[in-house]
């Protein structure tokens, strides 16, 4: 399946007075050392991924491969000190973070869980076969099938997919008795909570002097968030344990490097292979 905003740096003025150099430092609310770098990461492979199920807010555990890729990511991130780690409150996200921290030598780093970082909710469709739902989703927008829908919508695919679940569940197309609060989320709802939480994390870390933060979330929610905050976003599927670096500086987030890179996983796999 196919995700935009940090403080002013000290200004330094240099002048010439009476033939000599004079440097005047003007303090600001934060300096360059207060920069925050968030390693926004998708969880490792789950049983739901393998079975091609709609996961959302439902709890599917990591597979053996999912644990191994989380370990590989950890090895690939060795040398990076994480001041804090945050995850959604789903087992697949929490366990991924634990393994990444362990194998990157950050085992003592505190982990905070929050529902704001969980996957997009799909309400009555949770646990469904993705293949079985594809036709229903495509029909919402007048497409023949899921493949045509994805090709036609391009980088908007993930948001439209989320909104299709929201529309269908709002209409109770599955004929369930779910409460409104348990039904599918819209893309805007996912984007709002992701954006709010990531900004909170960045500001909190900045007040503590800046540094690196590991954040583990899920593919759809990451894609939906990134689609709102950078023109680098292309809507490509977010692979398991893929990382997107977000730098928070001068009051804004900026994507640093590629979106959804497997660089750290590949680096970790090489380290393991060379042991």
Region locations from a protein language model:
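Acidic, low-complexity terminal tails and accessory targeting/binding regions
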Residues: 31-36, 122-131, 209-211, 223-275
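Solvent-exposed loop/turn segments at secondary-structure junctions
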Residues: 44-47, 91-93, 117-121, 220-222, ...
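Extended, basic/helix-rich recognition subdomains
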Residues: 182-235, 240
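Phosphate-coordination/substrate-recognition cap region in phosphate-metabolizing enzymes
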Residues: 74-159, 235, 239
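Solvent-exposed, polar/charged alpha-helical surfaces in well-ordered, non-transmembrane soluble domains
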Residues: 64-71, 75, 94-98, 188, ...
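Hydrophobic helical h-region of N-terminal Sec-dependent signal peptides
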Residues: 8-18
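Short glycine/proline- and acidic residue-enriched helix-loop micro-motifs
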Residues: 141-189
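An N-terminal RHG(E/S)-centered segment typical of histidine phosphatases
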Residues: 2-4, 12, 22-82, 90, ...
């Amino acid at each position: 399946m196919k995700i935009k905003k940090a403080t002013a740096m000290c200004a330094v003025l240099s002048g010439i007075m009476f033939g000599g150099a004079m440097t005047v430092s003007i303090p600001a609310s934060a300096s360059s050392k207060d920069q925050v770098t968030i390693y926004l990461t998708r969880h490792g492979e789950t049983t739901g991924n393998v079975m091609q199920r709609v996961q959302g807010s439902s709890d599917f555990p990591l597979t053996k491969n999912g644990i191994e890729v989380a370990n590989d990511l950890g090895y690939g991130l060795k040398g990076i000190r994480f001041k804090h780690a945050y995850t959604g409150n789903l087992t697949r996200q929490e366990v991924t973070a634990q393994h990444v921290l362990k194998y990157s030598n950050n085992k003592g780093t505190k982990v905070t869980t929050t529902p704001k970082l969980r996957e997009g909710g799909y309400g009555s469709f949770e646990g469904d076969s993705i293949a079985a739902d594809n036709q229903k989703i495509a029909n919402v927008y007048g497409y023949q099938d899921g493949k045509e829908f994805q090709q036609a919508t391009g980088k908007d695919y993930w948001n439209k997919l989320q909104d299709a679940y929201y529309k269908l569940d709002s209409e109770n197309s599955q004929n369930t008795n779910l409460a409104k609060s348990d039904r599918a989320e819209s893309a805007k709802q996912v984007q709002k909570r992701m954006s709010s939480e990531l900004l909170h994390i960045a500001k909190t870390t900045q007040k503590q002097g800046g540094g690196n933060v590991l954040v583990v979330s899920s593919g759809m929610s990451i894609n939906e968030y990134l689609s709102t905050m950078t023109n680098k976003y292309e809507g490509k599927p977010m692979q398991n344990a893929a990382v997107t670096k977000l730098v928070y500086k001068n009051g804004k987030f900026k994507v640093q490097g590629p979106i959804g890179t497997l660089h750290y996983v590949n680096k970790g796999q090489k380290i393991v292979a060379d042991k």
